[in-house]
């Protein structure tokens, strides 16, 4: 049975691993997945690559991804690398 929505907290110490785990859950989700990024104050190149891969998988599966609690600096980096428009945002 597919889940209608999932909320995942992303820890700054294990961003890549958490995004990979969230990506594995996308098979069983219909609708949307919310990622809580409130603990992230910076994002490194490996995490950006993982975000892009996660967005690709979500797009393929038709799952809307909502980012919650995004730091302004993190948002600016997502915008610079053209990832910001692939997500929705809530405070």
Q: Which residues fall in each region the model found?
A:
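Short, charged, intrinsically disordered terminal tails
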Residues: 89-91
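Short amphipathic
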Residues: 1-9
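Amphipathic alpha-helical interaction surfaces in cytosolic regulatory modules
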Residues: 10-87
